[in-house]
């Protein structure tokens, strides 16, 4: 096995003596940094069918707190995966939708979902490996 170090402008990876702030061990690390975590993938999947307001996203992911949803939306917007659109109305209306970059992640998340269905619950419940 070998380790490939890649530099990606605009991304901050490990900091330390051995690696610069924009280096990752591999491109998988970049992807996990962008879409990893407990909530990012769920928010992205929730937005795959179109624009939603904060309250609608919160309703569709009932276990996420408002504070964590706010933080997750900000991180996804900062990464360029979602767009936040503020409408000049009273009361204010804000909608979130996937960017092209965000849409490009959906097939990957769909594949992870299928993998989870195939191996996750089957192994937990029966102790057997799925086909």
UniProtKB/Swiss-Prot annotation:
It holds the Pfam family HxlR. The keyword Transcription applies. Keywords: DNA-binding, Transcription, Transcription regulation. InterPro entries: HTH_HxlR, WH-like_DNA-bd_sf, WH_DNA-bd_sf. It comes from the Archaea. The keyword Ligase does not apply. Residues 26-124 form the HTH hxlR-type domain. Gene3D superfamilies: Winged helix-like DNA-binding domain superfamily/Winged helix DNA-binding domain. One of its GO terms (molecular function) is DNA binding. This is Uncharacterized HTH-type transcriptional regulator MTH_1285. The lineage of its organism: Archaea, Methanobacteriati, Methanobacteriota, Methanomada group, Methanobacteria.
